[in-house]
UniProtKB/Swiss-Prot annotation:
Gene3D superfamilies: P-loop containing nucleotide triphosphate hydrolases (3.40.50.300). Pathway: Cofactor biosynthesis; adenosylcobalamin biosynthesis; cob(II)yrinate a,c-diamide from precorrin-2 (aerobic route): step 10/10. One of its GO terms (biological process) is porphyrin-containing compound biosynthetic process. It is an enzyme of class 6 (ligase). Catalyzes cobalt insertion in the corrin ring. Its EC number is 6.6.1.2. It comes from Sinorhizobium sp. This is Aerobic cobaltochelatase subunit CobS.
Length: 332
């Protein structure tokens, strides 16, 4: 006979915050939040810049218990966006990377041998899903489209906002905590990878995709906004001259993305790559060398001349990988 777990409903949001004041978005929306955080609340990044549409989608997930998926290219800050919203709401947040080694047992739980009163006994230990389901936690599944099929069907049980989680091994039915929230990030929106960039991803059952009540896309930002983000993250580039340098860096990234879309490049610079490049430039004191070790060396050898040409167009400086230099070396 199934036993139902009646939760002690506590740890509910005890305040509300103004989206306009906290996130700088022009709306009258107010969102429930906690006045105090705990150990599971992400660290707050005071310089983080929010994308309007993505932020509103995530806030709707917190305020109205919507299941929200954030899709987009790598390095655009999908998971970080969710974390930084949670940080400002003081909402506990836990991320789980759905790589191919995460199994059903990891999510649901398993029998473990424990010592009680000096004796070894077998006891069921909840996995991350039952634990989060019973607490005021925002659970984020990263790389959602890389999850194994058996794992995905376990998750499907909890995608409905009032869905109950049945643990067959324990004959238990778990009701969700009213402040439990579920998010996911993905590169392919469950349709499979057509670019060749995301090996290991797969198509997601459309019956499951249909249960995600909000799907938002976070792709590459407009040039000036990306410059703002990089300059805010890397303090050494905040002056006018530094901002001009960052603008050239983002220009290189824009050129690689255009080449990728046209099919001329198989790799692409993400906003994360630009930030890493700026950080490495600050470490080495050499923008060209930092570019080489941050991105250029990751490119196919046959494509490096094109990437070096993008650098030359933005900075007006030739790298040794430029096609002209390669020809000169070959004829020398």
């Amino acid at each position: 006979m199934m036993s139902k777990i009646d939760l002690d409903i506590s740890n509910l949001p005890d305040t509300t915050i103004s989206v306009r004041e906290v996130f700088g978005i022009d709306t009258d929306l107010r969102v429930p939040a906690y006045s105090k955080g705990d150990a599971y609340v992400p660290d707050l990044d005071p310089d983080y810049l929010f994308d309007r549409e993505t932020t509103l989608a995530i806030l709707a997930g917190f305020a109205h218990n919507r299941r929200v998926m954030v899709s987009g290219y790598h390095g655009t800050g999908k998971s970080t966006h969710i974390e930084q919203v949670a940080a400002r709401l003081n909402w506990p947040c836990v991320r789980v990377n759905l790589d191919s080694h995460v199994s059903r047992i990891d999510l649901v739980g398993k029998d473990a041998i424990v010592v009680k009163d000096g004796l070894q006994v077998t006891e069921f230990k909840d996995g991350i899903l039952p634990w989060a389901y019973q607490h005021n936690v925002a659970l984020v599944f990263d790389e959602y489209d890389a999850g194994r099929p058996d794992v995905m069907f376990v998750i499907q049980r909890v995608l409905e906002s009032s869905g109950r989680l049945t643990l067959l091994d324990q004959s238990r039915v778990i009701r969700p905590h009213p402040a439990f929230r579920l998010f996911a990030t993905a590169n392919t929106v469950g349709l499979g990878d057509t670019t060749g960039l995301y090996h290991g991803t797969q198509q997601i059952n459309q019956a499951q995709m249909d249960r995600w009540s909000i799907v938002t896309t976070l792709n590459y930002l407009p040039h000036d906004k990306e410059v703002d983000i990089v300059a805010a993250k890397v303090k050494g580039f905040t002056a006018d001259k530094g901002r001009e340098t960052v603008s050239k860096m983002v220009r290189v990234a824009d050129l690689t993305r255009a080449a990728f879309i046209n099919g001329d490049l198989s790799t692409v610079m993400s906003p994360r790559t630009v930030i890493t490049w700026a950080e490495n430039a600050h470490i080495f004191g050499d923008i060209a060398f930092a570019f080489r070790v941050t991105f250029l060396n990751k490119c196919d050898e046959l494509e490096r001349a094109l990437v070096a040409e993008h650098y030359q167009r933005a900075f007006g400086i030739e790298l040794k990988e430029c096609a002209a230099n390669i020809v000169l070396e070959a004829t020398a």
